[in-house]
Amino acid sequence: MSDDRRRGDEDGGAGTGVITKTKPKTKKPSLYKVLLLNDDYTPMEFVVHVLERFFNKGRDEATVIMLHVHQHGVGICGLYTYEVAETKVTQVMDFAQQHQHPLQCTMERE
């Protein structure tokens, strides 16, 4: 081999450089409050049932939330990611409509 080739291969063909490891920055997803709105027609027992069925609340906690909705006009059912909150709102609205109750359920960003 010629001397020129040997000199060019002194570093084994690998260039010098700095390897940096970057840590991906993951952002926590935004949370959304699922809210029940009070009305004068939906029975309180139906609201308790909705909270138990769709939000996994125990009887006592569901009753407390229902009374809060009744007294204050609105109450928080839970905090969820956008997709989960949207699904729960749809489920509650469909269920209320099937049972001919005007119960309203909405979501808003935390």
Swiss-Prot record:
Pfam families named in the record: ClpS
Chain segments carrying region Disordered: 1-27
Example GO BP: protein catabolic process
InterPro entries: ClpS, ClpS_core, Ribosomal_bL12_C/ClpS-like
Listed Basic and acidic residues bias regions: 1-10
NCBIfam families in the record: PRK00033.1-2, PRK00033.1-5
Entry-linked PANTHER family: ATP-DEPENDENT CLP PROTEASE ADAPTER PROTEIN CLPS, ATP-DEPENDENT CLP PROTEASE ADAPTER PROTEIN CLPS1, CHLOROPLASTIC
Family designation: Belongs to the ClpS family.
Function as written in the Swiss-Prot or TrEMBL entry: Involved in the modulation of the specificity of the ClpAP-mediated ATP-dependent protein degradation.
Subunit relationships: Binds to the N-terminal domain of the chaperone ClpA.
Name the UniProt record assigns to this protein: ATP-dependent Clp protease adapter protein ClpS
